[in-house]
Curated annotation (Swiss-Prot):
Name of the gene encoding the protein in the UniProt record: tnaA
Subunit structure: Homotetramer.
Source organism of the structure: Caldanaerobacter subterraneus subsp. tengcongensis (strain DSM 15242 / JCM 11007 / NBRC 100824 / MB4) (Thermoanaerobacter tengcongensis)
Entry-annotated residues carrying N6-(pyridoxal phosphate)lysine: 261
SUPFAM superfamilies per the UniProt record, alphabetical: PLP-dependent transferases
Protein name: Tryptophanase
Membrane-spanning ranges: none
Record-linked PROSITE patterns: BETA_ELIM_LYASE
Length: 462
């Protein structure tokens, strides 16, 4: 484990580098305008520090790259699939495993098997693609995160927790037969990368059992959640990360995972089912026409091998300590400068409170997105909005959803940037904050009907 000295440095050596392109302010003003003021539509070559997402952006280890050379590209029965199954079974304790090309592929396969039209999926706080797949399957996603998550200024160790009283009351009101399943997202991205405590998971399991409802996990950042439990929850300080993960998932019936986060790979996802063989059979039947045969699920053998090795590597406590503390390093710099963030910082990103940063910009004009545009113009930094733009419209009313939390997410890729990059990011945010009164909101030029933030085009409100 780290001592105070070694905590200051990354616990790895850099073997390969990629040059970063430096653009001028004038070029960035032109480029973002050409992209319709949508940072998703920028070319990556025109981005200096890319904090858009931690999904698929990790730097793989030499051990993972070595595994890539052992890819068994057989259509059926790949040895890399067998290795992946063994690793998942060992870490999570789930019997049945199928790979998918990424997390949303897992949701697209699994959710229609679990959701009947009009049923509710109760989560701590669903992310955008998850909520979209719930709605595409005919369901309704309901967020049940604790009220403390909405208070960005004050400390709470587990802001990703379910409000268990609200959860049970909702089930009583709507009837258990109208609940498709409960989905625990660990860590809770939309709340600020915030962890869920073991005690809360246990209580959600108790409620699920009481009403005969299944509990699934969105396990994209499972190891980061386990690290927070070890650091913050009494009784777990002396347990290994692997032991904590095993206990967490013992309370679930299955999980979907974007392996592009904590499995430290650039592509891949998983569906794992604890012991329901009948559901596993249905998953396989759905998987084949959509993702590919059961033993590859849209992935090359080499990618499954890298995923298996990444799942093992992410359990290293030294890595996790550095990872979480790099996020904290950036968050502390911003907080010390008076910039409003979700406090404490979460596992994969620093979340700036856009409504407090730009109180003069109405939420319908996407204040957090406006900050993202200004960060790119200021320093070539690409962040992402997790707020009203991402939330989309209510399918019943057609009105913009206006979430209580409206964030700029500074998402830190794993094993990619040093704290020198974080210093640049902090300075850029401070400069934007200093001229915040001059920043205007945005409106649509083109608005797609689904997941609009990916391909929308916008313009400043004059």
């Amino acid at each position: 484990m780290y001592d105070d000295l070694t905590r200051m440095a990354e616990p790895y050596k850099i073997k390969m580098v990629e040059p970063l392109k430096i653009t001028t302010r004038e070029e960035r003003i032109r480029l973002i305008k050409e992209a319709g003021y949508n940072l998703f539509l920028l070319k990556s070559d025109d981005v200096y520090i890319d904090l858009l997402t931690d999904s698929g952006t990790a730097a793989m280890s030499d051990y993972q790259w070595a595994g890539m050379m052992l890819g068994d590209e057989s259509y059926a029965g790949s040895r890399n699939y067998q290795h992946l199954c063994e690793v998942v079974q060992d870490i999570f304790g789930y019997k049945y495993v199928v790979p998918t090309h990424q997390g949303r592929g897992a949701e697209k396969v699994l959710f229609p098997l679990l959701i009947k039209k009009g049923q509710y999926v109760l989560g701590n706080m669903h992310f955008d693609t998850t909520k979209a797949h719930i709605e595409l399957a005919g369901g309704i996603g309901i967020d049940m995160v604790i009220k403390e998550a909405e208070d960005t200024e004050n400390y709470h160790p587990f802001k990703g927790n379910f409000d268990v009283e609200a959860l049970e009351n909702f089930i009583k009101e709507k009837g258990a037969e109208n609940i498709a399943f409960i989905l625990a997202t660990v860590t809770c991205n939309s709340a600020g990368g915030q962890p869920v405590s073991m005690e809360n998971i246990k209580e959600v399991r108790r409620i699920a059992d009481k009403y005969g409802i299944r509990l699934f996990f969105d396990a994209a950042r499972f190891a980061e959640n386990a690290y927070f439990i070890k650091q913050r929850e009494k009784g777990y300080e002396n347990k290994s990360i692997k032991e904590i993960v095993r206990e967490m998932f013992s309370y679930g019936d299955g999980f979907t995972m974007s392996a592009k986060k904590d499995a430290l790979v650039n592509i891949g996802g998983l569906i794992a089912i604890k012991e329901d063989e009948e559901l596993f059979t249905r998953v396989k039947t759905m998987l084949i026409p959509m993702e590919g045969f059961v033993t590859y699920g849209g992935l090359a053998g080499r990618d499954m091998e890298a995923m298996a090795r990444g799942l093992e590597e992410v359990l290293d406590e030294n890595y996790l300590a550095w990872r979480i503390n790099q996020v904290k390093y950036l968050g502390d710099k911003l907080r010390e400068a008076g910039i409003p963030i979700q406090y404490p910082t979460g596992g994969h990103a620093v979340f700036i409170d856009g409504k407090k940063f730009l109180p003069h910009v109405p939420q319908e004009q996407f204040p957090s997105h406006a900050i993202c545009v200004e960060l790119y113009i200021e320093a070539g930094i690409r962040a992402v909005e997790v707020g009203a733009l991402l939330a989309g419209r209510d399918p019943e009313t057609g009105q913009n959803r206006l979430p209580k939390l409206d964030f700029v997410r500074l998402t830190i890729p794993r094993r990619v940037y040093t704290n020198s990059h974080m210093d640049v990011v902090a300075e850029a945010v401070k400069r934007v904050y200093a001229r915040r009164d001059q920043i205007k909101g945005y409106r649509f030029v083109y608005e797609p009907p689904i997941l609009r933030h990916f391909t929308a085009r916008l313009e400043p409100v004059e």
